[in-house]
Curated annotation (Swiss-Prot):
One of its GO terms (molecular function) is calcium ion binding. It is a peripheral membrane protein. The modification Phosphoserine is found at residues 337, 341, 368, 589, 644, 700-702, 1277. Disulfide bonds: none annotated. The lineage of its organism: Eukaryota, Metazoa, Chordata, Craniata, Vertebrata. Residues 618-631 have a biased composition (Gly residues). It comes from Homo sapiens (Human). It comes from the Eukaryota. This is Membrane-associated phosphatidylinositol transfer protein 2. The gene is PITPNM2. Catalyzes the transfer of phosphatidylinositol and phosphatidylcholine between membranes (in vitro). Binds calcium ions. Gene3D superfamilies: 3.30.530.20, HAD superfamily/HAD-like. Residues 715-963 form the DDHD domain. Belongs to the PtdIns transfer protein family. PI transfer class IIA subfamily.
């Protein structure tokens, strides 16, 4: 739901406005009623006494809007649904109107209006709730300044030119509002609160925005201009005169609409019945209250709402079968919306119910007749100048955090620019759908970018709070390359001669042919050059802006259906290679194969028919990097060149030998060129007339923007990821493969680290890419993107290519050897993993959804339709390998799968060498099954609209671009998480030596996880150090203590300011006035001098709480690691911990490591998705860490009165657990059994998977007894929303980790939720190693917002 408050000042009194409004409504009703498809019927007009606003007039109208909505949307609606029913309650100066539509039950427009004698300064006319205020956008409409579409502009309706002959008012200046307020002239304002709701899958945001921008705002601008400029017609009229005009208008409307009624007699009776009516207007004879006092009774009761279902009985429209089919379509996707959460399908907060009491009472009749006025092709208009948003700005996803007052140190540089808060820049290359006509609608492109920006903001506020303000979105409009192809193919349709058979004509359009024709056009090359130029311009504008001036983060591209093709080819054209790190997905690639002929056959065709000159004719005959072989030489002159090796230079004539492919035989290259010529001849026969009549470089004008290099230009920045939304790129590349059989598609490597091809399986525009890179992938389903409603932080399934190859070993071997004729360099082996290539939703530390809950899902009785099998099994056990499923087969982990032998090393290396990145490329999104029954012509528009508003897409994108530097619980209850802002500004250090000591060192602060009873002391202790080994102590400096008392959405409460002692320690006892009840509360201590901080939690528990203790190194780690490398995780460990947490036990993690490693260890726990719990460390380096563990556990038992239920560890921990009087049945030891300890503990010999099965099925694990504790403890995981730089910045992109094995045979173990069979929770070594091996404490940038911890 989109909620906007329009404020429309007018230079008249409230009473004059009433007359003007009534006159304008009846006049527009006469002028704009044409019959079926466009017109108004008045069905009921009666007074009411106990309704909205007290007493007034109720009116029931029907608007026929079939001519005013887009054809693709009209094709999916039943004919009876092409009408809008209006119910209005008018108690002037308060009115309320509600619009609904038959057969579209999830659609409504509620408009509530107050008319006040001010200029729009009233801050809260409607007394909105906090939830509604958060969603509200205030939009001022100025009848003078706001632009009007050219096709609607009339000189006589221009307030800047109009002057009344009766009143001598006008013309109005651009600052007329200020002038009228100063001179005390009459002025009033219409406050209109408009709520638009269209709760249908995939279309909600686009349709709601469409209604607001075109059906409401544009109509209101025009109507109020007319109300002012028509004052010579209505000035001096009385209410009696208005009533007579309304009667005449109603009779005229009834007669005109009756001509199109199939039942003439019924229509005649309708005319007679309406003619007898005394009240013919939507307004009451006299207002019940005109003194301007607030009117009571705003709630809309049931008896006030008359049913609009009677309109379904109208005999107009198609046959009943057509009605039932269309109605079923809409109900199907509406049902899908009902089964999902509000976050996915509509923007309304869950507190906003569907009850009528929650709808605002809106604008009355102002925009009645113009509700959907001529919106088939809306004119672009800029309405942002007068738009005052209470949310995020235009395309930037940011939080409204006040700038902090920075007091610089004496030695600081006063002119140094602060670092940019933006860490990720998303460039949206918007090209529209393949069915778009003309140049496209700029406002629609801008609206889509706004929609996805709002979805980013919504998702981040709930589950990724520290990402707020760190991500920026910029729009790059793309040329409509498919419009000419669409026009051509439309003319070829067998139904092209019959304009009345629109749906039949468009259903016969071969959609797959459109991108093939578009990319084969000679104009396509210039379109790619235009995209590169516009992207560079957008990036340059961002760098010049204040927020991007010091930007040093990553840049990602998002390409839609058409924009994705242009983005891919622009990346292939780009002659700026990615750095040759071990982790680069382009390492060893054949960059020289990115020649223009591989991108568009039309380019070679153009070059072959051109004379010399022009730098290669915009790329024909030259290389992609410039410096072509002979400028504009024809194809014949280059026949002797072999395109299978690096004979054509890219930029300066030199090329790294590592970038060469094995040289092919000359006969192969000859065959390749012959094939090109054959294709040229075929295309030339289609375009011969064009090529013969036009000069050589028909489109060589683009070379002026390419510096005469003969190439299409390049991006001025590095690009890390390319995201494609429903893009038919696979078809385009398949055509190029067909044209040039010797071409391997993998050779067309885009200049980015990873390609993500997101699509809906039912989208006719989409196609897969993976089978083009490796044929055997056609047998594997695309990776199913988890639903945001179920798994807001991801379901833990691995997207790594190496895991897919290992898991589906048998499937790959069944389908034989790779099909690519070219052999990838075998010397490369398997690329070493890097942070950029592995920090996916799999390795993202924020994916903390419980893995055991996935494993425990029972299969439902599902339909056997392909789309259900593909899309509806997101969390269910997959069917047999022969049945397509959303995730790899055999998701249920089994020991047999874990021990399955891997593919031969050469095979893995060969497939990986051809891959565009190190993760899966094809990703399937959820869509309702009912969409398969929709008309084909409607699907491209519908699916294209769905990507921008999909929370599935946005959460997936966030997981790919995030990295994490600190830890926190991430709740899964859907509540918004409060954003932390330091309560105190930065100050000078208390000691002059401090700023010298802290040079070139990073903070390593930590707060001990605290445990307390409700009635006992609640003490917080922390230590503030700098350097990974605590080399510098923060002595005598201020530290501010903050706590969140109502997590996760509560406010951060400032408690006190402490001063560190000589060892950097602070201790704080929470006072009685702020004593905490049972629960888990985030704690944050911020250093006043530099705003670095530490995070922790205090857990308040009742006495008798039961807990389960785990030794981190003893029970979880499968390898030994002291500092530098990432310990491997024992398979199934996460699921065992999760099992105990689900039973209601408090989780305690103990380790003998020093507290200086807290950030690293907690980050490692989060990296592997462990449930949240209390973590205990030693106080510095101690001689006997086992004694520390025992003493800590004894303290919990003796002083806090907690009870140990079970304990896990290694053989070294047996003595610790025995010291706290645990029985052998409560001690579980991981490792090889020893005779000495056989009677003292239970050994887990068959792994955690078998142990978990025993716990579940032998009833050895009972639920915790203390129900109060179970309600208080959160079931979240360690999540890492991080602080300032949790997003990957450019200097981290190509970093590799030495602990990562270089060969594919070295694979670390994974937990059961990370096992091969389930592929859940596989975690890359590289990111965890980065977290494990370096300090993670963040720094609050000036004005930055850090997520709560």
């Amino acid at each position: 739901m989109i909620i906007k408050e329009y404020r429309i000042p007018l230079p008249m009194t409230v009473e004059e406005y009433r007359i003007a409004q009534l006159y304008m409504i009846q006049k527009k009703s006469r002028n704009e009623t044409y019959g079926e498809g466009s017109g108004v019927e008045i069905l009921e007009n009666r007074p009411y006494t106990d309704g909205p606003g007290g007493s007034g007039q109720y009116t029931h109208k029907v608007y026929h809007v079939g001519m005013h909505i887009p054809s693709w949307f009209r094709s999916i609606l039943p004919k009876a649904a092409l009408r809008v029913v209006e119910e209005s309650w008018n108690a002037y100066p308060y009115t309320r109107t509600r619009f609904t539509c038959p057969f579209v039950e999830k659609f409504s427009i509620d408009i509530e209006t107050f008319y006040k004698t001010d200029a729009g300064e009233n801050p809260d006319v409607f007394n909105l709730s906090p939830v509604e205020k958060n969603q509200l956008t205030i939009d001022f409409i100025d009848i003078v300044k706001d632009p009007v579409p050219h096709n609607e502009y009339k000189t006589e309706e221009d307030p800047k030119l109009f002057q009344s002959t009766k009143t001598q008012r006008g013309p109005l200046s651009e600052n007329w509002i200020e002038e009228y307020k100063k001179q005390v002239f009459p002025i009033m304002c219409a406050y209109k609160l408009c709520k638009v709701e269209f709760r249908y899958w995939g279309m909600q945001s686009k349709i709601e925005r469409f209604i607001h921008d075109t059906g409401l705002r544009r109509v209101m601008v025009r109507a109020h201009r007319q109300a002012w400029c028509w004052q010579d017609e209505w000035y001096g009229l009385s209410m009696e005169n208005i009533r007579e005009l309304e009667k005449e208008a109603q009779l005229m409307l009834s007669r005109k609409m009756a001509q199109f009624n199939e039942d003439g007699e019924e229509a005649t009776e309708l005319v007679k019945h309406e003619a007898v009516s005394d009240q013919t207007s939507g307004e009451p004879p006299e207002p019940s209250s005109s003194n301007g006092e607030p009117l009571v009774g705003r709630g809309l009761k049931k008896q006030w709402s008359t049913s609009s279902k009677s309109s379904r009985s109208s005999k107009r429209g198609a046959s009943p079968s057509r009605h039932s089919i269309s109605e079923w379509r809409m109900q199907s996707i509406a049902r899908d919306s009902d089964e999902s959460s509000d976050d996915e399908f509509f923007d309304a907060h869950e507190d906003l119910s569907d009850t009528e009491e929650m709808f605002p009472k809106d604008i009355t009749k102002w925009s009645s007749n113009d509700l959907m006025d001529k919106i088939e092709s809306p004119e672009p208009e800029d309405t942002q100048d007068g738009l005052y948003r209470q949310g995020a700005p235009e395309f930037r996803v940011a939080s409204s955090v006040e700038q902090l007052n920075i007091i610089e140190d004496e030695v600081s540089q006063p002119l140094a620019a602060p670092p940019s808060k933006i860490h990720v820049l998303l460039l949206v290359l918007h090209g529209g759908t393949i069915l778009d006509t003309g140049a496209g609608d700029p406002s629609s492109k801008k609206g889509d970018a706004n929609t996805i920006a709002n979805v980013f903001d919504t998702v981040m506020r709930v589950h990724y709070p520290s990402a707020l303000g760190r991500l920026a979105i910029r729009l790059v409009p793309c040329p409509p390359v498919c419009s000419d192809a669409f026009a051509l193919v439309s003319n070829l349709s067998p139904y092209s001669h019959d304009e009345g058979c629109l749906s039949s004509s468009q259903d016969h359009i071969p959609l797959a042919a459109l991108p093939l024709l578009a990319t084969s056009s000679p104009q396509y090359q210039e379109a790619v050059a235009t995209v590169i130029q516009r992207a560079n311009l957008a990036y340059g504008d961002f760098i010049k802006s204040q927020e991007g001036m010091t930007f040093n983060g990553q840049v990602c591209l998002i390409g839609d259906c058409v924009g994705g093709i242009l983005a891919f080819d622009a990346l292939c054209y780009s002659n700026q290679p990615v750095s040759e790190s071990q982790s680069s997905s382009r390492r060893g690639s054949v960059v020289s194969m990115q020649d223009n002929d591989l991108l568009s056959p039309g380019i070679l065709m153009n070059a072959a028919h051109c004379c010399g000159g022009g730098g290669g004719g915009g790329g024909g005959g030259g290389s992609s990097g410039g410096g072509g072989s002979s400028g504009g030489s024809s194809l014949e002159s280059s026949r002797h060149l072999s395109r299978s090796n690096v004979d054509i230079p890219r930029s300066n004539g030199t090329e790294d030998p590592k970038r060469q492919l094995p040289r092919k035989r000359s006969d192969s290259s000859t065959y390749e060129l012959d094939t090109i010529q054959q294709h040229q001849a075929f295309l030339s026969s289609l375009h011969a007339s064009v090529l013969r009549t036009e000069p050589c470089s028909r489109h060589s004008s683009s070379s002026t923007m390419l510096d005469g290099t003969g190439a299409l230009g390049r991006f001025d920045f590095e690009i890390t990821d390319l995201f494609l939304f429903g893009c038919p790129l696979g078809l385009v590349l398949a055509l190029r493969k067909t044209v040039i059989p010797a071409l391997d598609v993998f050779q067309l490597r885009p200049a980015c680290q990873q390609v993500y091809n997101l699509f809906h399986p039912a989208d006719p525009s989409a196609s897969r890419l993976e089978p083009l890179l490796e044929r055997r992938f056609h047998a594997l389903p695309p990776f199913s993107v988890p639903r945001y409603q179920r798994y807001p932080l991801g379901d833990g399934c691995s997207t790594l290519l190496a895991d897919v190859l290992q898991t589906h070993n048998a499937a790959f071997q069944e389908h034989g050897a790779p099909s690519s004729p070219g052999t990838a360099p075998a010397s490369r082996g398997f690329r070493r993993a890097s942070e950029i290539s592995i920090a996916s939703q799999v390795s993202g530390m924020a994916e903390s959804y419980t893995a055991s809950s996935i494993a425990q899902k029972a299969p439902d009785a599902l339909s056997h339709t392909p789309s259900v099998r593909r899309l509806s099994l997101l969390a269910l056990p997959a069917p047999s390998p022969t049945t397509p499923g959303p995730h790899p087969p055999a998701r249920k982990a089994s020991p047999g799968l874990e021990r399955a032998p891997g593919l031969p090393e050469l095979d893995i290396g060969e497939v990986a060498a051809k891959w565009w990145g190190q993760k899966r490329i094809d990703y399937a999104l959820y869509c309702p099954d009912a969409l398969t029954a929709f008309p084909t012509v409607a699907l491209p528009h519908l699916f294209h609209a769905s990507y921008w508003e999909s929370t599935d897409v946005v959460s997936f994108l966030l997981r790919q671009v995030m990295r994490h530097d600190n830890s926190s619980i991430l709740e899964l209850d859907g509540k918004e998480v409060s954003v932390f802002t330091p309560s105190k500004p930065r100050e000078k250090w208390q000691r002059k030596r401090t700023h010298v000591k802290l040079r070139n060192v990073t903070a390593n602060h930590r707060i001990n996880d605290a445990l307390a009873n409700e009635d006992g002391p609640q003490v917080l202790t922390g230590r503030f150090m700098y350097g990974p080994l605590d080399m510098v102590t923060l002595t005598g400096e201020k530290v501010d203590v903050h706590i969140m008392t109502q997590p996760p959405s509560g406010e951060w409460l400032y408690l006190d300011t402490l001063v560190t002692n000589n060892s950097g320690r602070v201790s704080y006892t929470i006072p009685e006035s702020h004593r905490l009840g049972v629960g888990v509360y985030p704690i944050k201590m911020v250093v006043r001098g530099d705003h670095t901080f530490a995070d922790s939690y205090i857990t308040v528990l009742p006495k008798g709480t039961e807990f389960v203790v785990f030794s981190i190194d003893g029970s979880f780690a499968a390898s030994v690691s002291i500092m530098g490398s990432d310990p491997k995780v024992r398979a199934g460990a996460v699921d065992v911990v999760r099992h105990w947490q689900d039973l209601g036990y408090l989780i305690i993690y103990v380790t003998g490591r020093p507290d200086m490693q807290k950030q690293r260890v907690v980050a490692w726990l989060a990296q592997h998705n462990f449930p949240h719990g209390v973590v205990s460390f030693c106080d510095g380096l101690v001689h006997d860490p086992l004694r520390h563990k025992a003493n800590f556990l004894k303290l919990l038992i003796s002083e806090l009165h907690l009870r140990v239920h079970a304990a896990y560890g290694s053989t070294k921990d047996v003595a610790v657990y025995s010291a706290i009087s645990l029985s052998p049945m409560q001690i579980y030891i991981v490792g090889r059994p020893t005779k000495k300890l056989q009677q003292q503990c239970q050994f887990i010999t068959d792994g955690y998977a078998a142990h978990l099965a025993q716990l579940k099925y032998s009833h050895r694990a009972r639920p915790a007894r203390n129900t109060a504790t179970r309600m208080a403890l959160r079931k979240g995981s360690f999540g890492l929303p991080g602080q300032g730089d949790f997003l990957r910045s450019r200097n981290h992109l190509l970093r590799t980790i030495s602990a990562q094995p270089s060969g594919p045979s070295h694979r670390h173990e994974r937990t059961q939720s990370q096992a091969d069979g389930e592929q859940r929770g596989q975690r890359s070594m590289s990111v965890a190693a980065g977290c494990w091996g370096r300090a993670m404490t963040g720094r609050l940038e000036p004005g930055a917002a850090a997520g709560p911890k």
